[in-house]
UniProtKB/Swiss-Prot annotation:
Coiled coil: 5-41
Domain of life: Eukaryota
One of the record's GO cellular component terms: ESCRT III complex
Organism: Xenopus laevis (African clawed frog)
Stretch list, region Disordered: 170-196
Protein name per UniProt: Charged multivesicular body protein 1a
Length: 196
């Protein structure tokens, strides 16, 4: 299980590197577009622009994949933690069986206290696991926060992005992402129904 966790984290890092490389390539292509336009060569600029868009989309896809792999790594980490808690609970149960068979009230009381403590720890771990799984399952952040961050960065760099943000469909972080959003909403509802 630990090897799986390591491999998932390693894969997520590789995907993030690929996303950065694609973004760098996109920026290079955009510089070529600018140069071609300065030379009044629109056809060449169009080819470079297509390359820039393709590379940008490729980078976004790598980044989405990295995010999903990271979410799976979080789930595996939670499973490893729960495995340890379960092992501790099994040990306490065995100790309780031994104490009950000898009927030594002091031992029974001590084991019951330890068992209560383990149950409380399990409740805390379960709560943390549910919180991390719900955040990992949705794979989204509130749209308002995303928009605010984009506006903040744009203002810091003197960029105009409000028109572009207004063109995106409500609740989507990029064009063509509404089907992904629907799937994520369905997964969130299923997770909520499993909790109840």
């Amino acid at each position: 299980m630990d090897d799986t966790l390591f491999q998932l984290k390693f894969t997520a890092k590789q995907l993030e590197k690929l996303a950065k490389k694609a973004e760098k390539d996109s920026n290079t292509e955009q510089a070529k577009v600018k140069k071609a336009l300065q030379q009044k060569n629109v056809e060449v600029a169009r080819v470079y622009a297509e390359n820039a868009i393709r590379k940008k989309n490729e980078g976004l896809n790598w980044l989405r994949m990295a995010s999903r792999v990271d979410a799976v790594a979080s789930k595996v980490q939670t499973a490893v933690t729960m495995k340890g808690v379960t092992k501790n609970m099994a040990q306490v149960t065995k100790a309780l069986d031994k104490a009950l068979s000898s009927m030594d009230l002091q031992k029974v009381s001590a084991v019951m206290d330890k068992f209560d403590q383990q149950v409380q720890n399990l409740d805390v771990h379960t709560s943390v696991m549910e919180d991390s799984m719900s955040s990992a399952m949705t794979l989204t952040t509130p749209q308002e926060q995303v928009d605010n961050l984009i506006v903040q960065i744009a203002e810091e760099n003197g960029l105009e992005v409000m028109d572009q943000l207004n063109q995106l469909p409500q609740g989507a972080s990029s064009v063509g992402e509404s089907s992904t959003r629907t799937q994520e909403d369905q997964l969130s509802r299923r997770l909520a129904s499993l909790r109840n």
